[in-house]
Amino acid sequence: MYKTEANKIIVSATALDVKATLECGQLFRYEKTDDGYTVKSGAHSCDIYASGSDVIIETASVDYFVNFFNLDRDVNRTKRELSRFPELRSALESCGALRILHQPLFETIISFIISANNNIPRIKAIINRLCGMFGDVFPTPEQLAAVPVRQLNAIGCGYRSQYISDSAKICAETNILNRLHAAGTEDAEKMLMSLPGVGRKVADCVTLFSLGRLEVFPVDTWMLKTQRQGMETEPQLRRRVMEKYGIYAGYAQQVLFYYNAILRNN
């Protein structure tokens, strides 16, 4: 599936669709380059480009990005399991080897608080400005907790500024991050929703994109638009699709989002 060399990860393109993985709404710290993408996470970065039938990930943090891209997971097995559902087949065929990332927990919490009622270009810009305050590195809970709310306002966080500050302080002053890693999915979601600015959708995104709980199905406006049956409420839709797709519901959500919101909408 992949092999590593000094400062390089070589992945078969059949095991990693870079565009689908980066542009499906789960990650905000990436930029297109002339020959591929640059991705940043925490204090780490990598450059990604195609080489024949392979994807090359150049980085000084090889082990970090093997884990970040979840390269030990057989994504094509997941796709085969979901292909028994006829309504998913077009999306599955269109998204290639989209992978659910394994992102740092605190960074994911803050990024998705910023994402609420926002669009991707603006989210990316705010997060880039936030990281720019710390040398282009995502801040630790302690660093972010020390930032005055007015400075968060100044970089465009708006009404989310107080939520970000308060959540950073909780993460800095308690052991909630360790508890989240150890908790079951339901308990993790309850803990997440105790943080200021974290509702059900943000909690679902964090448990899926950081904690790796693939059974979670975040419901956004695109899911309501394309997956809703009759007068279903968001909780009813979420419960139905999670029961239907089981342990792969989160993967189904990502391919449906990428297919409907990105591919068919452009």
Where in the sequence are the language-model features?
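HhH-family (HhH-GPD) DNA N-glycosylase catalytic core used in base-excision repair
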Residues: 1-266
